[in-house]
Amino acid sequence: MSFHSDLITSLGIKVTRLVTDSRAVTPGDTFIAYPGSKADGRQFIKQAITNGANAVIWEALGFSWNKTWQLPNLAVADLRHNAGEIADHVYGSPSQKMWVIGITGTNGKTSSCHWIAQSFCALGKKTALIGTLGNGFHSTLQPTLNTTPDAIRLHELLADYLTQGAQAVAMEVSSHALEQGRVNGVQFDVALLTNLSRDHLDYHGDMPSYAAAKRRLFDWQQLKYAVLNLDDSFGAEIAEQLQDKGVEVVGYGLNDAALALAERLGLRMVYGSALRMDTHGFSLQIHSSWGGGELHNTLIGRFNVVNLLGVMAVLLVSGVTLSNALHELSLVSAVPGRMQTFGNGDRPTVVVDYAHTPDALEKVLQAVREVVRREIVGIHDGKVICVFGCGGDRDRGKRPMMGAIAAKLADVSIITSDNPRSEAPLDIIAAIVSGITSGRKATNGTYQIIEDRASAIAQAVLSAHATDIVLIAGKGHESYQEVRGVKYPFSDAEVAQRALLAWRDEAQA
């Protein structure tokens, strides 16, 4: 840290605020300029100076300072990855003054992040959260473009939350953020792994590279606790590798193999047994190194149960008592767009979920399949109806995989448009359908193609019986549909609720 602080001191000016967007520079700001994925910040140095920048810190590789820019400046090699430590220094190392939990994994990050923050706040520990649904405090989240902000903005946010009285921060940490150094300079106290499955291969290229990016969080300097899902093979692998590395590994899971691994490695553990689930929620026996108890919640889905075990482990290593953890986790509810349920009772159950990977779609379909209502003989048995598509300009290899999964686990699949972006929706749909029609013997469900997403959702709900579950997967909380560079207003939840009203009107007619 002294290396960067000495360099900043050498500028001869007071650095109080760092900015990476030249358009956002105001008099007295220091401009940080490095190449990004879409533009090179160094091309906007002149604009930053015009807007009142008091100095410029710039990426040294492949660039020369224009001597007509008579302004204090500093060339730094690999600035993008050093920016976090520079920002940490400028903003007074805010993460060192709070309890910081980083959550990574393919699925479950958002729910886990929110449940940790909700539980801490309810217990009197003011907690900020940073993630997909926004940044800030739970009741006043500000929208965000990325799951994890860039390094400069991240440290500014941490400093702001500290000023507002935050004692803790729960933060989603994406693989992109770890790869690009967006969380560099942050002092993490606890790192939580939810799971690892196929995603973002359009960016990382292959699963080993994707896993390596996630793995970085568990090698973090001065990390105190690594909380790992031992039901997940990647979590079990990390647990083995972290032995005698100076960080305490804490496991969690539902499987006997997870418990056996924890016992063999001598780990503290949170383990669940005797799981019972229906459309109204679940009950679970808790066994842990902190004691035992019973957990009830209205959430549905085995994967949500596992996520709650991970959150419980985080709370326990953070000093929360088991009784308080059980109480608070019995009260948490579905995060918007994450197994969010509507209807039920005398209407079909509609579940809106962000599942956009093969593993996530499989897990949510298994979850609703486990709790779909089976009625007495002579009354309609519940079916699972799945509405989904795949995003354009993303990993194309997962499309047929998701089609095959839906065909296997749903009684009816309605293939529709997601966020097609620059691709033709019907081309994406055709790739999904290829997985349904590829001759797999396990394919039992029927399928339809309805390109318009609103029409697909309406058809699914209106055709459902009261005992059916309609799963609308892929977009979750998103309030738009992106087509050819334009984001049109669209909400799966709103469309589903309108369809449920129409279903009720038809049923009463």
Predicted feature locations:
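N-terminal leader/targeting and accessory segments in enzymes
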Residues: 1-85, 89, 233, 271-275, ...
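Short glycine-rich anion-binding loops that position phosphate/pyrophosphate groups of nucleotides
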Residues: 24, 36-38, 175-176, 198-199, ...
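Active-site beta-alpha connecting loops in nucleotide-dependent enzymes
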Residues: 36-39, 335-337, 367-439, 453, ...
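P-loop/Walker A phosphate-binding loop and immediately adjacent motor/lid segment at beta-alpha junctions
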Residues: 47-52, 57, 221-224, 245-249, ...
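Receiver (REC) domain switch/active-site residues of two-component response regulators
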Residues: 54, 189, 411
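Acidic, Mg2+-coordinating active-site environments of NTP-dependent enzymes
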Residues: 62-67, 179, 190-350, 435, ...
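Phosphate-binding loop of NTP-binding sites
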Residues: 65, 81-230, 234-247, 309-312, ...
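Glycine/aspartate-rich loop-and-adjacent alpha/beta segment that forms the canonical ThDP
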Residues: 469-502
